[in-house]
Amino acid sequence: MNKFRRVRVVGHDVRVAVRPGTEAGPPLVLCNGIGASLDLLEPFVEQVDPRIEVMRFDVPGVGGSPGPKVPYNFALLACFVGRLLDELGYDRFDALGISWGGGLAQQLAFQHPRRCRRLVLASTATGSLMVPANPLVLAKMVTPRRYRDADYASSIAAQLYGGRMRQRPDQVRHVLYEQERLGSRAGYLLQLLAGVGWTSLPALPLIRQPTLVLAGSDDPIVPLVNARIMRALLPNVSLHVFDDGHLGLLTAADELGPLVSEFLTAQTGGTPR
């Protein structure tokens, strides 16, 4: 059962959902994609081992969190999330980031090396220095229209998300709309700006945490080659390629939820979770 609450962090109200775990251990902190509220991740959360506590939040300006007072970048946002975790009483944590949230998760691992225990990167890349998507795909991501217009989202689902959406583009209505809360257009723009000029490429060799990279075999937004680049640069990494597209963490949650759970609960060097 998820517990929803609002947490005050450096003058901002942040909407948070916590699914308590049945055992003690670091929580899994979920960092969502651009423009997406925490509700979108529910299909994945349902597939995560119940022993693991799962925390997710709406970035300021997205979903149920009011807009930020000033623009931010990933470094500032990682500091902000660190303060949020302090307010929630979390010392150590595991981080999972999907798409845009993968950039935030990498920044968290880099800035909080003693607190971030393990890292999961799903359908994401290294920021501005990456193998980019087709320009026609990128053009469809400039605005949050796909979150506001179900017919439009269905019409572009195959080209934008790939994977299972190529055969069943109408499924995007279920994935994006059933539980989605809209943020402001300004909030979406600020998320775009946060990534301008940011790259994790030179920092990847310094991220020592055990890392699991999840990549779809048919992801138009983040081509698979980016995951292979990350595998080459991260010092303690495993790569899992799944047969789906950019939204695979949601549409293939029955496969990826248990896989992530196994990675997080595995013992390393005799130290239990």
Task: Enumerate the language-model features and the residues they cover.
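Active-site loop/oxyanion-hole signature of alpha/beta-hydrolase fold enzymes
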Residues: 56-96
